[in-house]
Amino acid sequence: MHSELKNVSKHLAELGAGILAQAQKNALYTGYYSHLDEGVLGVMQAAQAAELLIKAAIAKQHPLLIFSSVPKSTSVSGELLSMQDIFEDGKTIQYAELPEKLWATTGYKLPNQDVYKSFGKLRNTIQHFALPKRDVRAETARFIYAVVDPLMGHFWDDYAVNYVDVVEAKDDIFELLSNYGIKPRYPEELKDFAESVE
């Protein structure tokens, strides 16, 4: 394996967590002077964050497992497959196929796959067609805490509540989630904030 490929999992996990922080900001908080409901952006970002985090978990096994096709040895420029070769001729696994690939490579069965599939359809509807008449903020929050948070717990011993791109989010994140009927997992250092809502 080319040395460039060794940090793929770490890169995808960091990128996914960063996008998750933006997704939660847009899904749970309301900004000002926006012509578009930020909740719509939260849908797009949460789906992308999930996709990246699942790929990061798969890539821990081997980075090429996130690809459905890779360049052939006759089409690469050097002795080993490089990142440039993959950028030009590789194709990654699609969103809908990721839960099965995750299970096949790691043995981990993504929880709430019905939520995962439904949320993928919601993302596609927004991206390709129109804005649905649904509470996209609530659906995004449920998706994050039913699908993404357990994934983070299993592979990184981490929590989705740690990734909200708002200063001092810990002060109100649990109340905001409670409004959607969500009681998230949380690290010990957030126990007092979480229990103040119960």
Question: Where are the regions a protein language model picked out?
Answer:
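Secondary-structure edge/capping motif, primarily at the C-terminal ends of alpha-helices
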Residues: 23-34, 61, 126-133
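A broadly used, surface-exposed interaction patch
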Residues: 59-119
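Short, solvent-exposed segments of well-ordered alpha helices
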Residues: 3-14, 33-41, 110-117, 138
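Polyanionic, low-complexity intrinsically disordered segments
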Residues: 114, 132-198
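Active-site-adjacent bridging/hinge elements
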Residues: 13-27, 119-124
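Short, solvent-exposed secondary-structure capping/transition elements
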Residues: 54-67, 135-138, 161
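Short, hydrophobic, well-ordered secondary-structure elements
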Residues: 17, 38-60
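Histidine-centered, metal-coordinating catalytic motifs and their short helical/loop contexts
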Residues: 109-136
